Each structure stands twice: as structure tokens, then as C-alpha cells.
């Protein structure tokens, strides 16, 4: 069988596979697994939010809330991972965030939450991709944004 570089309907991508694809590491690796994937068209990533994460020391000590910018980064990492996987590329290549549009934060994400990050490809042109991203906790939308990113060979 010829490898086209396209991944279709994989059941899950665990943390070991994510570490082989993404260059991010603790404390900036913000997805724990991808539970559903359909090539670079759509995926659902998981972020298990724990009180041990360093940003909770200062955001906010008495009432910890995951910073919105880190929710956006988790979305970008999920989109980046499926882009690299679909192209058959790994952490030697990079995905650069280009734009964030229409970002909305509807509810706080707190320690103990499991955030599901839905990403859907809206447009693809050469190495540039645009995704609709929706983050949910227990089925409730907590954030959404459209992001554009570029896959770059290192």
C-alpha cells in the first residue's frame, strides 16, 4: 500500500505519539491526547486541567482559573498535531500560529476540569490551514476561536 501521508479515522493519539509529533514539553504541552481524528479535517483533543500546573500559582492563587491564552494554545496545539500527523511529519517540523480571530471565553476552566478541544478544518492552502476551534467542559462550551497556522519544515 502506498503511504499518502494522510491519516483517516484513527481512534486515538496518546501522549507518547503526541510527544513524537509536537515539539512542546512541560510546562507548555497543553494537550494530553487526541481521542478522535479524521486526517487534518477534524479532531477532538483532551486537556486534563490539574492544580499542579505552574500558571495556577499566580492565576489566581485563591481562585485558580486557566488563562484564556493557554486555552487558545491548547486549541493551536491540537490543530498543529493533526496537521503534522496528516502530512506524515513530526516534531522536526513546526506549526506557527498566524492569526486568532473571533476568540470568545464563555466560562472559566478550573483545576479538575477535562477540556475537550474540537478542531475543524475550514480552509487549506498550501502549508496554511484555518481551523474552527471549540473548547468544552462537560458538554458546555467554554471557549471558541478561529485560528490560522502555517506548517514549516525546519
From Swiss-Prot:
Swiss-Prot/TrEMBL keywords? Cytoplasm, Lipid A biosynthesis, Lipid biosynthesis, Lipid metabolism, Lyase
Catalytic activity reported: a (3R)-hydroxyacyl-[ACP] = a (2E)-enoyl-[ACP] + H2O
Bilayer-spanning residue ranges: none
The subcellular localization recorded is:
Cytoplasm
State the EC number(s): 4.2.1.59
> Which molecular function term from Gene Ontology is one that the record holds?
(3R)-hydroxyacyl-[acyl-carrier-protein] dehydratase activity
Give GO cellular component annotations, separated by semicolons: cytoplasm; membrane
Which top-level group of life is the source organism from? Bacteria
Catalytic residues (UniProt): 59
GO annotation, biological process: fatty acid biosynthetic process; lipid A biosynthetic process
Q: Which PANTHER family match?
A: 3-HYDROXYACYL-[ACYL-CARRIER-PROTEIN] DEHYDRATASE (PTHR30272:SF1)
Q: Which family does it belong to?
A: Belongs to the thioester dehydratase family. FabZ subfamily.
The UniProt function text for this chain reads:
Involved in unsaturated fatty acids biosynthesis. Catalyzes the dehydration of short chain beta-hydroxyacyl-ACPs and long chain saturated and unsaturated beta-hydroxyacyl-ACPs.
Protein's name according to its UniProt entry: 3-hydroxyacyl-[acyl-carrier-protein] dehydratase FabZ
Record the organism. Bartonella bacilliformis (strain ATCC 35685 / KC583 / Herrer 020/F12,63)
List the lineage, top down.
Bacteria, Pseudomonadati, Pseudomonadota, Alphaproteobacteria, Hyphomicrobiales
